[in-house]
A protein has these predicted regions:
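Short, conserved non-catalytic motifs in the polymerase core
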Residues: 60-75, 97-123, 139-152, 173-174
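Generic, well-ordered alpha-helical scaffold segments in large soluble proteins
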Residues: 22-25, 29, 55, 59, ...
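Short, small-residue-biased leader/transition segments that mark boundaries at the very start
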Residues: 1-7
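Conserved catalytic palm subdomain of right-hand nucleotidyl-transferase polymerases, strongest
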Residues: 62-71, 115, 154-193
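N-terminal alpha-helical targeting/anchoring segments
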Residues: 8-78
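Duplex nucleic acid-engaging cores and interfaces of nucleic-acid transaction enzymes
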Residues: 18, 35, 115, 119-129, ...
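Reverse-transcriptase-like RNA-dependent polymerase core
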Residues: 56, 86-110, 123-131, 158-167
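A short, contiguous, amphipathic alpha-helix enriched in charged residues
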Residues: 74-89, 193-194
Length: 194
């Protein structure tokens, strides 16, 4: 999906569930250095939960069951009110279920482990992501492209190519730290972020 379409779809969904003004406010407050309290009120708000369902439902993986055997379809048959209450209940004492482990092939023929969370865990985590994302995005470097909303490797390549052309650079170094994400010290990483 192109970044313009991605942005348009995300905005349309957030506006439909009346969450966009909240997200814009979180972004602006974070940009100005605000310290946040009471985020659980926003995270567990019915409209944020409904938006999380909509966003997860749009993922191909929503039809793949975790260790509990449930998919998005098993939640879609519930009444909206019952579904919202089920997710809100999770926030009182949230403990994620075990993650289903599968191996998927990499382009080089080797296998890569993939974890598939239970669908309820995906919804809960999406609720948290939707609220934390505007807060964090306000602090991130504008030209950081990895694992960011509506950004891609193509965006990074385009930016790097422009820099190389403008500055008459002739060399590119490709660095891939094997297993970086699995081995990074998260305490140090969090200190760097905040």
């Amino acid at each position: 999906m192109g970044s313009e379409m991605c942005i348009r779809d995300r905005l349309r969904h957030a506006e439909y569930y009346d969450m966009q003004k909240t997200f814009d406010s979180l972004y602006a407050d974070s940009k100005s250095g605000e310290v946040f309290g009471h985020l659980m009120d926003i995270i567990s708000a019915p409209n944020n939960i409904k938006l999380a369902f909509r966003n997860i439902k749009g993922n191909d993986g929503s039809h793949t069951a975790g260790t509990d055997g449930r998919t998005i379809e098993s939640l879609a048959v519930m009444s909206e009110d019952k579904f919202v209450k089920l997710i809100q209940k999770q926030f009182r004492r949230y403990e994620p279920k075990a993650v289903k482990r599968v191996e998927i092939p990499k382009p080089n023929g080797k296998m890569r482990p993939l974890g598939i969370p239970c669908i309820i865990d995906r919804i809960v985590q999406q609720c948290i992501l939707q609220v934390m994302e505007p807060i964090c995005e306000a602090k991130f470097y504008e030209h950081s492209y990895g694992f960011r909303p509506c950004r891609s490797a193509e965006n990074a390549i385009s930016y790097a190519y422009g820099l190389a052309q403008r500055n008459k650079l002739h060399y590119v170094v490709d660095v891939d730290v094997k297993g970086f994400f699995d081995n990074v010290d998260h305490r140090k990483l969090l200190k760097q972020i905040w």
